[in-house]
C-alpha cells in the first residue's frame, strides 16, 4: 500500500509519537501541557526516592570511615619472605 509523499497520516505513527515532532523529536505544545501538572510531583518523587540510596551510601561511608582496623592482627613477615613476595608481584606484572 503506497501513500502520497505529502500525506500526513497519523495512523501510521505509534500513539506516543504523535506528540513529538517527527523531524526533531521535540515535544509538542500539547505534550508539554499534558505533562505540566506532573512536573513538580515527579521532581519531588525523584528527590525522595533518590535520597534513600544516597542516605544509605553516606551512612555506610561515614561508618566505615571511622573504622581503624587496629583490632586485626598483621602477621609478621620476614625480610626474605617480603623480597620473595615482591619478586612474585613484579613477575606477574
Curated annotation (Swiss-Prot):
Is the keyword Heme assigned to this protein?
A: no
UniProtKB keywords? Membrane, Mitochondrion, Mitochondrion inner membrane, Transmembrane, Transmembrane helix
Residues in the Mitochondrial matrix compartment per record = 1-43
Q: Does the keyword Mitochondrion apply?
A: yes
Please provide, in alphabetical order, the Gene Ontology terms of the cellular component aspect for this entry.
Answer: mitochondrial inner membrane
Its membrane topology is listed as: Single-pass membrane protein
Q: Write out the annotated subcellular location.
A: Mitochondrion inner membrane
Topology check: give the Mitochondrial intermembrane ranges: 65-93
The transmembrane residues are 44-64
Q: Which GO terms describe its biological process?
A: mitochondrial cytochrome c oxidase assembly
Q: Which InterPro entries match?
A: Coa3, Coa3_cc
Q: Tell me the disulfide pairings in this chain.
A: none
How would you summarize the oligomeric state and partners of this protein? Component of 250-400 kDa complexes called cytochrome oxidase assembly intermediates or COA complexes.
Q: What does this protein do?
A: Required for assembly of cytochrome c oxidase (complex IV).
Q: Tell me its family.
A: Belongs to the COA3 family.
Q: What is this protein called?
A: Cytochrome c oxidase assembly factor 3, mitochondrial
Q: Name the encoding gene, please.
A: COA3
Amino acid at each position: 500500500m503506497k501513500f502520497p509523499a505529502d500525506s500526513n497520516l497519523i495512523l501510521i505513527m505509534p500513539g506516543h509519537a504523535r506528540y513529538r515532532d517527527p523531524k526533531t523529536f521535540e515535544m509538542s505544545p500539547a505534550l508539554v501541557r499534558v505533562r505540566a501538572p506532573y512536573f513538580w510531583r515527579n521532581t519531588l518523587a525523584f528527590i525522595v526516592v533518590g535520597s534513600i540510596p544516597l542516605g544509605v551510601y553516606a551512612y555506610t561511608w561515614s561508618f566505615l570511615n571511622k573504622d581503624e582496623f587496629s583490632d586485626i592482627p598483621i602477621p609478621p613477615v620476614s625480610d626474605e619472605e617480603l623480597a620473595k613476595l615482591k619478586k612474585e608481584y613484579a613477575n606477574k606484572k
